[in-house]
Amino acid sequence: MGILPDNTHTLACDACTSWGMAGVITFGGSFPEYPGLDGLFWQMTWSEWKKVYQTPYLIPGKVIINVAEFLAALITYETFAKFCSHKTTTLRIDSRVAQAWLDSCRCPKHPFDRCAQAVHLHMLKRSAKFRTSWVPSGDNSLADNFSRERFSANSNGHVVSGQRFRKVKPTWNNVIKFL
């Protein structure tokens, strides 16, 4: 038993070398702020990311998958931080390398190591703790769907895997602070 109680919400993220990256929060039960929804998701293509920040690691056609998975996790943490304050929240990820980097708050690819430190500091300020859970790619289908196909900002939400999700804008202020 940790100091912070477990969160009923679950996070998941994924990256795809050909299309982009995404993250999702699945609500554990009803959430009054978002009635009728099972969760929220963000997604971004590599072309869209290139407009945010140009890096030799993540450009369309030259994506290093472990770095991409790591970045997707950091953006997922930051985007859904308000749902994770004062709780321990599980992040499902299908990259063992990115999982190890997240667990150690370190990444051997500069400048993403600095990004990780900024996001972890942001989480500490929110009294949020994350634990990673590796899942086989086949069991990460929800995040996989969002990282491989464009979904619009439909206010009614999108039904994916029998659940209703609404698209939100990703937050990356702490992620890109050191880029």
Predicted regions located by residue number:
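Two-metal-ion RNase H-like nuclease active-site motif
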Residues: 6-20
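A short, polar/acidic, helix/strand-boundary loop motif
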Residues: 30-71, 97-107
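Conserved, non-catalytic sequence blocks in retroelement Pol enzymes and Pol-derived host proteins
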Residues: 2-3, 16, 60-65, 104-112, ...
